[in-house]
Amino acid sequence: MDLHESESRTHVLSTDGDDGYIDMEVNLSSSSSSSTSSSSFFSFPVTSSPPQSREFEFQMCSSAVASGESTTSPADELFYKGQLLPLHLPPRLKMVQKLLLASSSSTAATETPISPRAAADVLSPRRFSSCEIGQDENCFFEISTELKRFIESNENHLGNSWSKKIKHSSITQKLKASRAYIKALFSKQACSDSSEINPRFKIEPSKVSRKKNPFVNSENPLLIHRRSFSGVIQRHSQAKCSTSSSSSSSASSLSSSFSFGSNGSLDLQTLMRSSNASDNSIEGAIEHCKQSFTTRKSNVTESELCSSRTSVSTCGDLDKD
């Protein structure tokens, strides 16, 4: 049976300025039968104003397929190769479901049916909306802030633990030092006691006597090794005042010596006596310096008076002459 469709007449402006219109006729004829091929004919008669009118035709032959047969199109081939997104049709969805089940059979096989939207989401690139992107960014920001807080809390905890450990170690070191000091004191006393027991290690007080600094606070035996600046100045002043009496020198020599007791510790009475003797020697030296200064002044005044008298007497003798 032949199907003939009517022609369509179109009027198009020509490029030439003199010509008004170009008449074009399109005739489409198609025939379909039980045979496997059909042909379509397109004829385009063109009429123009010039006398040399041309008429040309286009012919197109297309192969038709019987209704009972099915052929594979390039889209199907691309779909099988995975290069084409699936259409939302039941057979395609079943194929996608089979492929997914085959791929996930190694890990976990799920037989739930896949909706068209889920299949499209699986095989199509995901398109994020602005709301979804904003939510993801918010989640990422919250996670990052929580991680930062967790790290900072851990660092603070570690820092506090280290500081506590350092403080504890310093305290333990101080305690150990104090214990060692106390043990040393007790060991010294024990050694002194043992020296008393053994006559070979008995120490005579005359040999152990040392020269003591008279300007040290004798009441506190722990500060014996320290010296004061004022003590040095007083020592220099005593060196200058070398014309002190023999009593003050003997007192200073007595005060500069101290002895150990029977138990190895310093005798407080001897220390007090030495401190009193040193104070007396200092006072005696100061008084001696004052006396020497006054005697020098008196000698100077007497010499000045004598010189003035001699000068006056010489002047009187000259006047008499």
From Swiss-Prot:
<feature type="compositionally biased region" description="Polar residues">
    <location>
        <begin position="297"/>
        <end position="314"/>
    </location>
</feature>
<protein>
    <recommendedName>
        <fullName>Probable membrane-associated kinase regulator 3</fullName>
    </recommendedName>
</protein>
<keyword id="KW-0472">Membrane</keyword>
<keyword id="KW-1003">Cell membrane</keyword>
<dbReference type="GO" id="GO:0019210">
    <property type="term" value="F:kinase inhibitor activity"/>
</dbReference>
<dbReference type="InterPro" id="IPR039620">
    <property type="entry name" value="BKI1/MAKR1/3/4"/>
</dbReference>
<dbReference type="GO" id="GO:0005886">
    <property type="term" value="C:plasma membrane"/>
</dbReference>
<feature type="region of interest" description="Disordered">
    <location>
        <begin position="297"/>
        <end position="321"/>
    </location>
</feature>
